[in-house]
Design a protein with these regions (language model features):
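Loop-to-transmembrane-helix transition segments
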Residues: 22-30, 76-101, 173-181, 231-250, ...
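Membrane-interface helix termini and inter-helical loops of multi-pass transporters
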Residues: 39-50, 106, 155-170, 223-240, ...
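Glycine-/small-residue-enriched transmembrane alpha-helix faces in small-molecule transporters
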Residues: 1-55, 100, 147-151, 161-194, ...
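Transmembrane alpha-helices of multi-pass small-molecule transport proteins
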Residues: 2-9, 22, 47-96, 122-127, ...
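Hydrophobic transmembrane alpha-helices of multi-pass small-molecule transport proteins
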Residues: 65, 136-160, 272-273, 279-281, ...
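Helix-helix packing/entry segments at the starts of transmembrane helices
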Residues: 29-32, 56, 113-119, 192-213, ...
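Specific transmembrane alpha-helical segments of multi-pass solute transporters/efflux pumps
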Residues: 36-37, 73-117, 151, 244-262
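Structural signature of hydrophobic alpha-helical transmembrane segments
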Residues: 49-63, 103-120, 171-184, 234-246, ...
């Protein structure tokens, strides 16, 4: 063994420690930032039209991703021409998952929305993949436990809404939108995951092409408030730009870095902490008046973590691990 090889082996432990440290820092930043952004939308952006909010936020993110693709000389046009079917499917599912997510955050607490959204994804992927992979007791037990707590969480929030009759309709809409958003995100994982592996799509190719339909639809629906966003004296346009960074751009970068350094299995156990962190932020900003719903939010987080731990020890990747590998974002 020559001197260079010996030096490389000596440096290996430090490199591993450094990579692990970076990975843990990035996944921690991802969870904190995603939770903060969700609470921010729920608390501060309820008066702006949901379509306008979605369009302006994703437009900033889209421009950022296109700039990165240009600098890296990614051939986006060729990717679109070669994968028309994949592009159409991913755009339709992205429209529902992202637009409904923003609408849900305007109608229900961020912790509840995040728990419903993240909790329904593993079950959707499990059902969709049942024919190809089968459903064993080990694969089904975790999602079944999550479904139980999701049902109890929805029922608890319904009951609380009943005590606040003026908000009942809004809360019901928020819960329904969060569940639909999470379910379509799960469908996105199932429909596009194999195609991305087969065709070797890069992260930037996916990110620069999946939001096009969403931008067209929300741009059309929310165009009447664009002037309000630009002329707002409270700096609404700047707030939306910062929101785009905190809810889309930076989380994607942090998540991908953590997956690269820690592996998808470890990361998939950390991401369900987002609703719990959102819950903690809500207690600081606007404390809950009762304890049942917050406890159920935490139980949903715990059940998803348990589900992912069980599935990550099986021979095949679990649904949320698959989501992290293929989608590049829990959103």
């Amino acid at each position: 063994m020559d001197e260079n090889q010996t030096h490389a082996l000596d440096e290996l432990p430090n490199a591993i420690v450094s990579a692990n440290t970076l990975g843990w820092l990035c996944i921690t930043a991802y969870c904190l930032l995603t939770a903060f952004a969700a609470v921010w939308v729920s608390e501060s952006f309820t008066r702006i039209d949901g379509a306008t909010l979605t369009f302006t936020t994703l437009l900033v993110a889209q421009l950022f991703f296109l700039s990165c693709a240009f600098l890296k000389k990614e051939n986006i046009l060729l990717f679109v021409l070669d994968n028309k079917s994949l592009i159409v499917k991913s755009n339709v599912l992205t429209l529902f998952s992202w637009y409904f997510m923003f609408l849900a955050l305007q109608k229900v607490e961020a912790s509840v929305e995040s728990a419903l959204y993240q909790g329904i994804i593993p079950m959707t992927v499990l059902v969709c993949s049942a024919r190809a992979q089968g459903i064993t007791l080990k694969r089904a037990l975790g999602p079944a436990l999550t479904l139980l707590f999701l049902t109890l969480l929805a029922e608890s929030r319904f009951s609380l809404a009943g005590m606040e009759s003026s908000h009942t309709s809004t809360i019901i809409q928020g819960i329904a939108l969060a569940l639909i958003a999470g379910a379509t995100a799960g469908l996105y994982v199932h429909v596009t995951g194999a195609a991305h592996r087969q065709w070797g799509a890069t992260l930037l190719q996916v990110l620069t092409t999946r939001f096009v339909l969403l931008l067209v639809v929300t741009g059309f629906l929310g165009h009447e408030q664009f002037a309000l966003v630009v002329s707002n004296e409270n700096g609404l346009a700047w707030k939306l730009m910062f929101l785009a960074l905190s809810i889309v751009v930076l989380p994607v970068l942090f998540l991908q870095t953590s997956i690269k350094n820690l592996g998808a299995s470890r990361v998939s156990v950390m991401t369900p902490l987002v609703p719990a962190l959102a819950l903690a932020a809500e207690f600081v900003i606007n404390p809950w008046g009762h304890i049942t719903t917050p406890i159920l939010v935490l139980m949903v987080c715990l059940s998803v973590i348990i589900s992912n731990v069980w599935l990550n020890h099986s021979d095949r990747p679990g649904p949320v691990e698959t989501q992290l590998r293929e989608e590049g974002s829990s959103r």
